[in-house]
């Protein structure tokens, strides 16, 4: 499996309810008078960072239990709106309808940014390949269907590509990463929109 980083990043936002989280009321090294449980959910992109933060915070705060479910940005926001979690992380900014449903005490803050990469596995091709922007747009839009397509071969002279179908692997849940990626595809040119594809957290990818 080889990956090709894309030259754009996505910002991860965190939603938090300021009520019901009494963790800021004691000083460094002090412990809360009662056990505190904090639940979060959302972005899979940010999950490794949350895991690290939670582990580091737990070292000096034995009375605080923090959990984070990496269920995707859309599901995380849904759980936060339903008051099922205390905070949620999303790679995509909230829609107006989602923002209207937030608790009054909710705040939204940027916490990190991440890169998105394309991963590919081509039998018989062990070298890194080049995929121009308009080419990978048409791959994900379903206009380029095989690895030996003339446009892929033209971008990679000297490489022998097999006459095999390109099998797309993409998120099937409500994902902020999908929203960021499809925004990128739509911004490159008209190919994405012209193919009838849309931008969003959950889309219908072309069937191979």
Go through each PLM region and give its residues.
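N-terminal secretory signal peptides that target proteins for export/translocation
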Residues: 1-6
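Bacterial N-terminal signal peptides
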Residues: 9-22
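Flexible loop/hinge segments at secondary-structure junctions
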Residues: 26-208
């Amino acid at each position: 499996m080889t990956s090709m980083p894309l030259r754009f990043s996505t910002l991860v936002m965190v939603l938090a309810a300021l009520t019901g989280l009494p963790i800021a009321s004691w000083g460094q090294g002090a412990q809360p008078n009662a056990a505190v449980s904090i639940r979060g959910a959302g972005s899979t992109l940010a999950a490794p960072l949350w895991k690290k933060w939670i582990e580091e915070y737990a070292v000096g705060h034995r009375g605080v239990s923090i959990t984070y479910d990496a269920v995707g940005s859309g599901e995380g926001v849904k759980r936060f709106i339903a008051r099922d979690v205390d905070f949620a992380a999303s790679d995509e900014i909230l829609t107006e309808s989602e923002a209207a449903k937030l608790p009054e005490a909710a705040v939204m803050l940027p916490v990190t940014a991440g890169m998105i990469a394309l991963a590919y596995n081509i039998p018989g091709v062990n070298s890194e390949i080049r995929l121009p922007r308009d080419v990978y747009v048409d791959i994900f839009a379903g206009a380029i269907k095989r690895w030996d397509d003339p446009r892929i071969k033209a971008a990679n002279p000297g490489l022998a590509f097999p006459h095999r179908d390109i099998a797309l692997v993409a998120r099937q849940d409500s994902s902020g990463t999908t929203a960021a990626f499809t925004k990128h595809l739509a911004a490159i040119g008209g190919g994405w929109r012209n193919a009838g594809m849309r931008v969003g957290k959950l889309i219908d990818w072309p069937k191979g």
